[in-house]
Amino acid sequence: MAKWLLQDEIGAAMVFAHELGHNANHHVADKIQNANTGALVGLLLGIAIGANPADAMDLGANIGATSYSIDYENEADYLSIYILALSGYDISKAPNFWRRFAVEVPNSIYSGGGTHPSTSERFIRLETYVKEVQDQIDKGLKPVPKYKKHKE
């Protein structure tokens, strides 16, 4: 995967900016908190129905950890375009990263209820994000994200 990823500078920059987006939005801490809450709920439900408490906790933790996952990915993608623009990258090239990703990782084309949006959803969203950022730049403004986190 790394060879195609590093085909041009924007691919590596996209991944890096995306991960910075997760960090800036505190997604790791949120996932840990969600997993802990899920584990507690799983434990209580497991005890209530007579299931193995450890298995119930594991199931609850997994469900908790993946809650909001697609929202987190969308937030990180959104912020990544701002990070790229502020870093001087040509953001118009960013959406095509997901086209290449779909070719190299075909099972990413469909989200299938997973933890990440499909590559086609990402491509479309990124085009919207690029337009939003470019509109700010065209007005002579410093790009500033216009969103509120999905949960506070």
What does each model-found stretch correspond to?
Residues 28-58, 95-98:
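Post-HEXXH active-site segment of zinc metalloproteases
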Residues 2-10, 20-37:
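Catalytic Zn2+-binding segment of zinc metalloproteases
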Residues 4-5, 61-65, 111:
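Short amphipathic alpha-helical segments at helix-loop
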Residues 14-24, 53-66:
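Catalytic-site beta-strand/loop segments enriched in glycine and acidic/polar residues
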Residues 31-32, 63, 67-71:
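A short glycine-/small-residue-rich loop at the edge of a beta-strand within enzyme catalytic domains
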Residues 8-13, 72:
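Envelope-exposed proteins and targeting segments
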Residues 24, 68-152:
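C-terminal capping/extension segments of zinc metalloprotease domains
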Residues 7, 29, 51, 86-89, ...:
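Alpha-helical structural elements of signaling/regulatory helical domains
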